[in-house]
């Protein structure tokens, strides 16, 4: 596959990831409200779980590396997850004096995302 074609597939993965992020974030607002950045937390945890599954699958030889790692890992998951929005969510919470919520958001994003990535990786390990 040419580099130009690969870039096109990465961009397509990014488009699907960005649309998925938007839809998941909007669903979280509908279901859980705007009192906490649930959407950002949700996409970061889901993305981490999927990254663990992807990397374990690649390392185990369950899927061929080929273009899938950059298409899914960089394109789709790169657009689905978000560190900049996570950072801004915390700045806004702190500006409003919501330091406990900001701390909880930081703790949950880091702990749950790493745990989800570990679980996803372990799920794909060969027995």
From Swiss-Prot:
Reaction catalysed by this chain? fluoride(in) = fluoride(out)
**How would you describe this protein's topology in the membrane?**
Multi-pass membrane protein
Give the keywords, sorted. Answer: Cell inner membrane, Cell membrane, Ion channel, Ion transport, Membrane, Metal-binding, Sodium, Transmembrane, Transmembrane helix, Transport
How does its activity get regulated?
Na(+) is not transported, but it plays an essential structural role and its presence is essential for fluoride channel function.
What highest taxon heads this organism's lineage? Bacteria
Q: Chief localization class?
A: membrane
Q: Which InterPro entries match?
A: FluC (IPR003691)
- Residue sites binding Na(+) per the record: 78, 81
MF-aspect GO terms: fluoride channel activity; metal ion binding
**Cellular component GO terms, alphabetical:** plasma membrane
Membrane-crossing segments per the record? 4-24, 35-55, 71-91, 99-119
**A GO BP annotation:** cellular detoxification of fluoride
Subcellular location as annotated:
Cell inner membrane
Its biological function?
A: Fluoride-specific ion channel. Important for reducing fluoride concentration in the cell, thus reducing its toxicity.
The record's section on NCBIfam families has: crcB, PRK14200.1
Family (UniProt): Belongs to the fluoride channel Fluc/FEX (TC 1.A.43) family.
Name of the protein in its database record: Fluoride-specific ion channel FluC
Q: Lineage in the entry?
A: Bacteria, Pseudomonadati, Pseudomonadota, Gammaproteobacteria, Vibrionales
Q: Which gene encodes it?
A: fluC
């Amino acid at each position: 596959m040419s580099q130009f074609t690969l870039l096109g597939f990465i961009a397509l993965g990014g488009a699907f990831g960005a649309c998925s992020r938007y839809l998941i974030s909007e669903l979280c607002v509908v279901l859980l409200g705007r009192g906490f950045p649930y959407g950002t937390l949700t996409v970061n945890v889901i993305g981490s779980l999927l990254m663990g599954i992807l990397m374990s699958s690649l390392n185990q030889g369950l899927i061929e590396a080929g273009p899938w790692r950059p298409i899914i890992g960089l394109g789709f998951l790169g657009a689905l997850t978000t560190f900049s929005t996570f950072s801004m969510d915390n700045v806004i919470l702190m500006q409003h004096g919501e330091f406990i919520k900001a701390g909880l958001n930081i703790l949950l994003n880091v702990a749950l995302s790493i745990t989800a990535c570990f679980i996803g990786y372990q799920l794909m390990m060969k027995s």
